[in-house]
């Protein structure tokens, strides 16, 4: 009889422990995890700069040629790219190789693009300095384009400072922007992508990173500051 009692006790104990483990495993993630001052203060070792600091660093220097990438640098152009994907290749990125998409994007769809405030501030600063403004984009070239007109209007660029957009295109294994930065003698180049920064460095120009908005359709988001370059604060919008 005692053996039976002990066996039953052991079985009950095992059942209780098993239920506790199951309950713990199925418990929901806490809704409020909390934080600490140390976590809140944690920052990546990035060389942050402001537009005012960039302007100050150029003080005393003669007017020069400066360049900007377009998409996610001065324009939040995801609406046009999103429409292009849905229209031409909903299940893939093949629309980026479709000339029909680029005809649409370069001839009107930037009317849906939102000018970034950092773009306004930077361009206004360089116009005030008397710099020559170039836009060098990885977009494919089309027979006609209204991007130059859109950018000039959106950012109030005087004709004396404005140059037509350079469509460098995209070629596998090649940074297509490098030759244009060299050819136009661009001294400062702003961009959101890694290849913008490396293109600038390849020609001895100052590459400055603009943050890509977290809701951009262009994924994955790049790691700003990964090359030790300057990164503009609050430049995601």
Curated annotation (Swiss-Prot):
Compartments, as annotated in UniProt: Periplasm
EC number: 3.1.3.2
Reported cofactor(s): Mg(2+)
Range of residues in the leader sequence: 1-25
Alphabetically ordered keywords of this record: Hydrolase, Magnesium, Metal-binding, Periplasm, Signal
Entry-linked SUPFAM superfamilies: HAD-like
Catalytic activity annotation: a phosphate monoester + H2O = an alcohol + phosphate
Active-site feature positions: 69 (nucleophile), 71 (proton donor)
Residues noted as binding substrate in the record, renumbered to the chain: 137-138, 177
Free-text cofactor note: Binds 1 Mg(2+) ion per subunit.
GO MF annotations, alphabetized: acid phosphatase activity; metal ion binding
Class of enzymatic activity (EC top level): hydrolase
Residues that hold Mg(2+) according to the record: 69, 71, 192
GO cellular component entries: outer membrane-bounded periplasmic space
Top-level taxon: Bacteria
Quaternary context: Homotetramer.
Protein family: Belongs to the class B bacterial acid phosphatase family.
NCBIfam families on file: AphA
Record's function text: Dephosphorylates several organic phosphate monoesters. Also has a phosphotransferase activity catalyzing the transfer of low-energy phosphate groups from organic phosphate monoesters to free hydroxyl groups of various organic compounds.
Name of the protein in its database record: Class B acid phosphatase
Species: Enterobacter sp. (strain 638)
């Amino acid at each position: 009889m005692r053996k039976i009692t002990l066996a039953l006790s052991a079985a009950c104990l095992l059942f209780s422990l098993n239920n506790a483990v199951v309950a713990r495993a199925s418990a929901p993630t806490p809704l409020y995890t909390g934080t600490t001052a140390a976590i809140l203060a944690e920052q990546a070792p990035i060389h942050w700069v402001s537009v005012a600091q960039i302007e100050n660093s150029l003080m005393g220097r003669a007017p020069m040629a400066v360049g900007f990438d377009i998409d996610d640098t001065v324009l939040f152009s995801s609406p046009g790219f999103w429409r292009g994907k849905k229209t031409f290749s909903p299940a893939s990125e093949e629309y980026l190789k479709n000339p029909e998409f680029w005809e649409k994007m370069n001839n009107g769809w930037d009317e849906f693009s939102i000018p970034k405030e950092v773009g306004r501030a930077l361009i206004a600063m360089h116009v005030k300095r008397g710099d020559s403004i170039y836009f060098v984009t990885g977009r494919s070239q089309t027979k006609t384009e209204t991007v130059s007109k859109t950018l000039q209007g959106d950012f109030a660029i005087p004709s004396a400072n404005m140059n037509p957009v350079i469509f460098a295109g995209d070629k596998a294994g090649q940074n297509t922007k490098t030759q244009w930065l060299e050819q136009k003698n661009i001294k400062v180049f702003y961009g959101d992508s890694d290849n913008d920064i490396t293109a600038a460095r390849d020609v001895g120009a100052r590459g400055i990173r603009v943050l890509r908005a977290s809701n951009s359709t262009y994924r994955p988001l790049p790691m700003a500051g990964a090359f030790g370059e300057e990164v503009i604060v609050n430049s995601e919008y």
